[in-house]
Regions:
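C-terminal structural segment of proteins
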Residues: 1-195
Length: 195
């Protein structure tokens, strides 16, 4: 059960589903289902400059790193993500700059690495991170994804607001800083600009 992505729906549905199919034969349509879709244009930019260029050309594109939330859009709501870019090769988004009393954390940093970085400077935030999700989730989930998808039940934004965090945002070659509390405009609405 440690592989369950979220804690918000509990484990009961997983246990019920497992019991419901226990001993049943695997249906042919599951065995014969192709793994890859018919078209697979899957850009994976290796720098934030390459990502900014791709995103400017695909302003409605979906950015994926850990996919712990976005994956549910597909599996639970059958959402067509349209153009997708995979961010896990973008190493400059996976950096943590420890400046003593300040941390600058890239959007692609996993929650496991955030936890390791914040334990001393912000022990309460570290304790909170340790309590949500499983090791598998924290190894995949990124701090940028948790903020950008704007989930009203997101774990990090309230803590980051309380700590006075600032977001460093980029659109093409234009960069701006905004307090994280100003990024969240209304329920489900963020100060995000296409591209």
């Amino acid at each position: 059960l440690a592989g369950k992505l979220g804690r918000c729906r509990g484990y009961a549905p997983i246990i019920r589903a497992a019991k419901a199919v226990e001993g049943a034969a695997v249906p042919d349509h599951v065995i014969d289902h192709p793994i890859a879709p018919k078209t697979t244009d899957f850009p994976a930019p290796e720098t934030s400059d390459a990502l900014a260029e791709w995103y400017a050309a695909h302003p409605n594109g979906t950015l994926i790193a850990g996919a712990t939330d976005v994956g549910l859009w597909v599996t639970k709501h059958f959402t067509d993500l349209g153009d997708v870019a995979f961010l896990n090769r973008c190493k400059d988004l996976q950096q943590i700059d420890d400046q003593g009393d300040t941390l600058r954390i890239g959007a692609g940093v996993t929650m496991t690495d955030v936890l390791a970085a914040v334990r001393i400077l912000h022990p309460s935030f570290g304790d909170m991170i340790r309590r949500y999700g499983s090791d598998q989730v924290r190894n995949a989930a990124t701090i940028g994804g948790n903020i950008a998808n704007g989930s009203p039940i997101g774990d990090n934004p309230p803590a980051l607001i309380a700590m006075g965090a600032t977001l460093h945002l980029r659109r093409g070659n234009t960069r701006r800083d905004t307090p994280i509390e100003d990024f969240f405009i209304a329920y489900g609405k963020q100060d995000r600009q296409p591209g």
